[in-house]
């Protein structure tokens, strides 16, 4: 098993407190996919939409039938290496679309439409729009995989240059990962399958007509007692281990030496403006889905972390950088942990998500913020 990076600050709340479940969570017999998307999925998935009068409920996407067999595909070939030169600054447009509620392109999102919340089998999520006209964050969740309540896959997606790429990733990335995974337990095969799922989603998005923008992604697959976390970009996964925060992902930004070296060796240019490192004077993240105009440098290959879930693993936080730019890993665990204690009736994980979002906003965040909390005691 690959190891994770521990953040060793002492938690405010005693790590010795037990967060074990007293009883299992009831689960629905069907797969459930949740996104903030505004359009239907392709077959074999159908969607149902809430009314426009219910802005706090995202679209519910339900898988009609679990896959009979999960198979492997082929790897993508390597990209070409371009000659390095300093280009002009590129502007990323922002698409004028609505947020979670189904509103017209011409409408200005209403104040009550700025937040979206959802609770499902073993997880809660809360998203709040920042100062942009359009909400660019998305999320997805598929639980009860193949009829097993202890198997699930989750994702949080942070779009830039409009919500199109994040919406596409929310609809397709987790399904693509599942389509690549064989039901076996071989760790190397699972890691390779997750990688191919990311690469396939990126390739499919770039084939769409008039695509623009991109999206950072973080996903968490839970299967057979294993936790498989992957990321491309600066969405982050943080695990509470007995009250201590462990970052299971590393942000992909051009300020990282290895990322900057990769970009420059491929002919790209990295510089800093107002203390922010950017690629080609434009983008501040170095991996993700989309970004066709920077594709030779913005790769979609994820970094992957696999570990065996044990009783000390209490809950997992997946969140966009709207949270992590203002709230540290340990702070997030300390704030969420009291709401994850006790019996199912006493737990309030959705309130924990809201508390984290509100803290980031109170510290000056102007970005979209999405926080998903996954209670691992239900899933191992």
UniProtKB/Swiss-Prot annotation:
Its cofactor is Mg(2+); Mn(2+). Signal peptide: none annotated. CDD domains: PP2Cc. This is Probable protein phosphatase 2C 2. Binds 2 magnesium or manganese ions per subunit. Transmembrane segments: none annotated. Mn(2+) 1 binds at residues 158-159. Gene3D superfamilies: PPM-type phosphatase domain. Residues 122-376 form the PPM-type phosphatase domain. The keyword Signal does not apply. It comes from Arabidopsis thaliana. GO terms for molecular function: metal ion binding; protein serine/threonine phosphatase activity. Its EC number is 3.1.3.16. Belongs to the PP2C family. Keywords: Hydrolase, Magnesium, Manganese, Metal-binding, Protein phosphatase. It catalyses: O-phospho-L-seryl-[protein] + H2O = L-seryl-[protein] + phosphate; O-phospho-L-threonyl-[protein] + H2O = L-threonyl-[protein] + phosphate. InterPro entries: PP2C (IPR015655), PP2C_BS (IPR000222), PPM-type-like_dom_sf (IPR036457), PPM-type_phosphatase-like_dom (IPR001932). Pfam families: PP2C (PF00481). Mn(2+) 2 binds at residues 158, 321, 367. It is an enzyme of class 3 (hydrolase).
